[in-house]
UniProtKB/Swiss-Prot annotation:
It comes from Parvibaculum lavamentivorans (strain DS-1 / DSM 13023 / NCIMB 13966). This is ATP-dependent protease subunit HslV. The lineage of its organism: Bacteria, Pseudomonadati, Pseudomonadota, Alphaproteobacteria, Hyphomicrobiales. GO terms for biological process: proteolysis involved in protein catabolic process. It is found in: Cytoplasm. Its main location: cytoplasm. The keyword Membrane does not apply.
C-alpha cells in the first residue's frame, strides 16, 4: 500500500447464488491514494436484455470498455454466456488495446457465475459465492459463513458487504445490488 496519489484503489464485488436467485452486489467507493474521490459509483449493472448481470473491479474506463465488448459478445452468442465470456477473454488477451485494460469482472446469468480476468481466464467458481476487488476476500469469507443460515441471497450479500466495508478502507456501504432468478 502506498500514498502515491495516482494509485487508484477500491471496489468490492460479491456474488451469491442461493434459493433460486443470483445476486451481485458492489460498493460505491472510488479512492485515489488515501482520498475518497467518489462514494456512489455504480459498478454493478444488468447487461444484454436484462438476463445477465455483471460487476467490475478495476479502472472504471477499462471496465466500461469491457462491459461494451461483453454486451456485443452476448448479442453475438445469445443464451451462451460462457461462450460470450470466452470470446471476450480471447480478445482481451490478444488485442493490443484490450490487453492493457486492468479490470476483473464477475458475470452471471440464471445458470452460471463466471470471473473474467485480463490474463484470459474465465473461471467458474465451485460454490455459488465469489468475491473480487480490494474487499473481495473479506466479503467472500463473510458470505461463506452466512450461506447456510436462513437468509436470502440478497440478505447474505448485503450482510457480507457490510462486513467487508467495516474491514477494508477501500470499500463503503453504498451498495448497488442486481439480482436474477436462477
Amino acid at each position: 500500500m502506498t500514498n502515491d496519489p495516482i494509485n487508484w484503489h477500491g471496489t468490492t464485488i460479491l456474488t451469491v447464488r442461493k434459493g433460486g436467485k443470483v445476486v451481485i452486489a458492489g460498493d460505491g467507493q472510488v479512492s485515489m491514494g488515501d482520498t475518497i474521490m467518489k462514494g456512489n459509483a455504480r459498478k454493478v449493472r444488468p447487461l444484454g436484455k436484462g438476463d445477465v448481470i455483471a460487476g467490475f473491479a478495476g479502472a472504471t474506463a477499462d471496465a466500461m470498455t469491457l462491459f461494451e465488448r461483453l454486451e456485443a459478445k452476448i448479442e453475438q452468442y445469445p443464451g451462451q454466456l460462457t461462450r460470450a465470456c470466452v470470446e471476450l477473454a480471447k480478445d482481451w488477451r490478444t488485442d493490443r488495446f484490450l490487453r492493457r485494460l486492468e479490470a476483473l469482472m464477475i458475470v452471471a446469468d440464471k445458470e452460471a457465475t463466471l470471473v473474467l480476468t485480463g490474463n484470459g481466464d474465465v473461471l467458474e467458481p465451485e460454490s455459488g459465492v465469489v468475491g473480487i476487488g480490494s474487499g473481495g476476500n473479506y466479503a467472500l469469507a463473510a458470505a461463506r459463513a452466512l450461506i447456510d443460515m436462513d437468509l436470502s441471497a440478497e440478505e447474505i450479500a448485503r450482510k457480507a458487504m457490510g462486513i467487508a466495508a467495516s474491514i477494508c478502507v477501500y470499500t463503503n456501504n453504498n451498495l448497488t445490488v442486481e439480482s436474477l432468478d436462477a
